[in-house]
């Protein structure tokens, strides 16, 4: 087996050396020129995401914690998981009023409160890197301070989107944020609540992840 393997690899190397492949530079002109106006970007994102059951709520930089709290109270949420080490988490802690859903800090390894996360958390709040007009997608950048489980496990995912953090294309997101120089373990592109058509090819939402995706547009 060893001789056969060596022979095959030697043959492949010889073929590669005898027929080198010329590298062709990529042409990103189409992506560079695909543009929408500022107002049109947000309307396009909303239209495309609402088509797959995403919900939108408007807020301002001053009142978004109160808007989120009121929305979750009306939705019947009892517990809200958040990342205390983030800027958004600090705002929640300082602004959260009594009488609303209970804030639950995500400041422990998941193994220490796995059961609570999967059975006792109603909503999770995350920041976003922005949204893409071309595809109608949110961009999440998970980190040690804000792990991806915040957006994947709770039944309701609250995503905070700053109205000026809008991009035309995924290519623009990657280039302007210099992804080539360093990426997290994973970046998430989210267009709506979880869905599947595995069962009799019937489309169903909220089967293996959040049942609702709420985008809070912060103007």
Residue ranges with predicted function:
Residues 1-219:
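The feature marks the mature, well-folded catalytic cores of soluble enzymes
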């Amino acid at each position: 087996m060893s001789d056969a393997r060596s022979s095959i690899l030697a043959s492949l190397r010889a073929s590669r050396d005898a027929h080198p492949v010329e590298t062709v530079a990529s042409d990103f002109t189409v992506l560079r020129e695909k543009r929408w106006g500022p107002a049109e970007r947000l309307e396009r994102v909303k239209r495309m995401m609402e088509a797959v059951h995403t919900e939108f709520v408007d807020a301002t930089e001053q009142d978004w914690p109160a808007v989120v709290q009121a929305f979750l109270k009306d939705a019947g949420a009892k517990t809200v998981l958040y990342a205390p080490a983030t800027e958004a988490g600090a705002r929640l802690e300082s602004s959260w009023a009594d009488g609303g859903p209970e804030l639950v800090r995500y400041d422990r390894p998941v193994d220490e409160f796995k059961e609570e996360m999967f059975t006792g958390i109603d909503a999770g709040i995350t920041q976003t890197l922005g949204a893409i007009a071309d595809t109608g997608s949110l961009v999440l950048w998970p980190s040690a301070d804000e792990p991806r489980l915040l957006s994947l496990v709770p039944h309701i995912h609250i995503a905070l989107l700053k109205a000026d953090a809008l991009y035309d294309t995924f290519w623009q997101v990657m280039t302007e944020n210099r992804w080539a120089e360093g990426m997290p373990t994973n970046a998430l592109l989210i267009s709506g609540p979880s869905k599947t058509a595995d069962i009799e090819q019937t489309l169903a939402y909220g089967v293996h992840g959040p049942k609702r995706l709420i985008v809070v547009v912060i103007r």
